[in-house]
Amino acid sequence: MTITPQQLIALLPLLIVGLTVVVVMLGIAWRRDHFINATLTVIGLNLALLSLYFVGQAGPMDVTPLLRVDGYSMFYTGLVILASLATCTFAYPWLVGYPDNREEFYLLVLIATLGGILLASANHLASLFLGIELISLPLFGLVGYAYRQKRPLEAAIKYMLLSAAASSFLLFGMALLYAESGDLSLAGLGKSLQENMMHQPLVLAGMGMMIVGLGFKLSLVPFQLWTPDVYQGAPAPVSTFLATASKIAIFAVVMRLFLYAPAADNEALRMVLSIIAVCSILFGNLMAISQTNIKRLLGYSSIAHLGYLLVALIAVQTHQLSLETAGVYLAGYLFSSLGAFGVVSLMSSPYRGPDADSLFSYRGLFWHKPILSAVMTVMMLSLAGIPMTLGFIGKFFVIAMGVSAHLWWLTGAVVLGSAIGLYYYLRVTVSLFLSAPEALQRDTPNNWALTAGGVVVLISAALVLLLGVYPQPLITLVQMAQPMF
């Protein structure tokens, strides 16, 4: 097939990130310089982000049978690149004191970003699987990057073994669907499934196995057991990527899959998804209550947040508002998580081994670093869904969509989960303002707000507050980011 200039423009983010991977690889081979390779990575990701403007000018199109570039893919590509940029920014000071090779970290983040961009544009089960593997494989290395410590190594092994099992379920499910429908493209699959095939045992088994595989990647109950251990064990900048870019990219492709394949029309599958959503919301929130480790707490809370998003997924076939809900919620979740994990990254350094992730480390932070603790407070309030924050707008959309789609049980679970969530988010917030322990040593530099990581954290906090008060620009952007049919 011949590729036109228009199609090349549509693939610009993918091509630029791919080229950056090659450039950084050659840079590492030529000369090991942490600053140069980090700068090349950030320049490449910024160019990929800027190229989305030109992609928008080219208009929506099917570049190949595997990739569909439209407003929807551009929006989620933008979110993934922003998360990757933030990860690299937080990682730079964290890696400065790292005793081993530092440059490969950026290479792995770039390859995972490539997978995220591929997932955002995936229009075929083959590109879906390739994207998921491309985002998962570098994460094994990233999670265990501080391999001299026991925790990251243990987290990497757990994540690798369970991820391999989940991928095999996903692939087996795809094979069963292909055996029944004879098509791997999402549109062709949807067309086959609409012709009264949703009750075929092979199709139900295939969809069930795919839900198992994708449920693991999104850390939904009962496939969530790896989440708190991996979040706690992974270095703070890696936990940032795991919580944001990885989840957003995979949820975007699952949403597109459900748009075509009428899985939620089948009563049995709809019931299974509803049970998974309710269990994820309740389990995530209830388990987070007793946590004393902030990364572990955020890991459990991410299970609950994906449970809330599942409400939008269940209604995606019947309700136009569900796409808008997912977009607004994921944008709010991205900025809130970047801020929260960013503060943990700024508080941590590999000089003394483990990250500053114990809740005790944050006790009385306000009296030493008032602006940093104010940022953390804003992020916790946003994740809890308190009004005047972007998190509230996302929760409002989820509840409004649940009510208009008559999903009463799920809406009730969202309200109950949000009420439980208030307790542990406010627990973190209150600890910031308690009297500080005298013997506690903190690694955060006094000029943290002037560092690149500090700037990212402050911008995230500003966006959470500004879009919480005036969300119309984000809502307009999400409304423009509609998938092409």
UniProtKB/Swiss-Prot annotation:
<feature type="transmembrane region" description="Helical">
    <location>
        <begin position="78"/>
        <end position="98"/>
    </location>
</feature>
<feature type="transmembrane region" description="Helical">
    <location>
        <begin position="271"/>
        <end position="291"/>
    </location>
</feature>
<keyword id="KW-0874">Quinone</keyword>
<feature type="transmembrane region" description="Helical">
    <location>
        <begin position="8"/>
        <end position="28"/>
    </location>
</feature>
<feature type="transmembrane region" description="Helical">
    <location>
        <begin position="125"/>
        <end position="145"/>
    </location>
</feature>
<feature type="transmembrane region" description="Helical">
    <location>
        <begin position="235"/>
        <end position="255"/>
    </location>
</feature>
<keyword id="KW-0472">Membrane</keyword>
<keyword id="KW-0812">Transmembrane</keyword>
<keyword id="KW-0830">Ubiquinone</keyword>
<dbReference type="GO" id="GO:0005886">
    <property type="term" value="C:plasma membrane"/>
</dbReference>
<dbReference type="InterPro" id="IPR001750">
    <property type="entry name" value="ND/Mrp_TM"/>
</dbReference>
<feature type="transmembrane region" description="Helical">
    <location>
        <begin position="203"/>
        <end position="223"/>
    </location>
</feature>
<keyword id="KW-0997">Cell inner membrane</keyword>
<keyword id="KW-0813">Transport</keyword>
<dbReference type="GO" id="GO:0048038">
    <property type="term" value="F:quinone binding"/>
</dbReference>
<comment type="similarity">
    <text>Belongs to the complex I subunit 2 family.</text>
</comment>
<feature type="transmembrane region" description="Helical">
    <location>
        <begin position="104"/>
        <end position="124"/>
    </location>
</feature>
<dbReference type="Pfam" id="PF00361">
    <property type="entry name" value="Proton_antipo_M"/>
</dbReference>
<dbReference type="InterPro" id="IPR010096">
    <property type="entry name" value="NADH-Q_OxRdtase_suN/2"/>
</dbReference>
<feature type="transmembrane region" description="Helical">
    <location>
        <begin position="408"/>
        <end position="427"/>
    </location>
</feature>
<dbReference type="GO" id="GO:0008137">
    <property type="term" value="F:NADH dehydrogenase (ubiquinone) activity"/>
</dbReference>
<keyword id="KW-1133">Transmembrane helix</keyword>
<feature type="transmembrane region" description="Helical">
    <location>
        <begin position="374"/>
        <end position="394"/>
    </location>
</feature>
<dbReference type="GO" id="GO:0042773">
    <property type="term" value="P:ATP synthesis coupled electron transport"/>
</dbReference>
<keyword id="KW-1278">Translocase</keyword>
<feature type="transmembrane region" description="Helical">
    <location>
        <begin position="35"/>
        <end position="55"/>
    </location>
</feature>
<keyword id="KW-0520">NAD</keyword>
<protein>
    <recommendedName>
        <fullName>NADH-quinone oxidoreductase subunit N</fullName>
        <ecNumber>7.1.1.-</ecNumber>
    </recommendedName>
</protein>
<feature type="transmembrane region" description="Helical">
    <location>
        <begin position="449"/>
        <end position="469"/>
    </location>
</feature>
<feature type="transmembrane region" description="Helical">
    <location>
        <begin position="297"/>
        <end position="317"/>
    </location>
</feature>
<dbReference type="GO" id="GO:0050136">
    <property type="term" value="F:NADH:ubiquinone reductase (non-electrogenic) activity"/>
</dbReference>
<keyword id="KW-1003">Cell membrane</keyword>
<comment type="subunit">
    <text>NDH-1 is composed of 13 different subunits. Subunits NuoA, H, J, K, L, M, N constitute the membrane sector of the complex.</text>
</comment>
<feature type="transmembrane region" description="Helical">
    <location>
        <begin position="327"/>
        <end position="347"/>
    </location>
</feature>
<comment type="function">
    <text>NDH-1 shuttles electrons from NADH, via FMN and iron-sulfur (Fe-S) centers, to quinones in the respiratory chain. The immediate electron acceptor for the enzyme in this species is believed to be ubiquinone. Couples the redox reaction to proton translocation (for every two electrons transferred, four hydrogen ions are translocated across the cytoplasmic membrane), and thus conserves the redox energy in a proton gradient.</text>
</comment>
<feature type="transmembrane region" description="Helical">
    <location>
        <begin position="159"/>
        <end position="179"/>
    </location>
</feature>
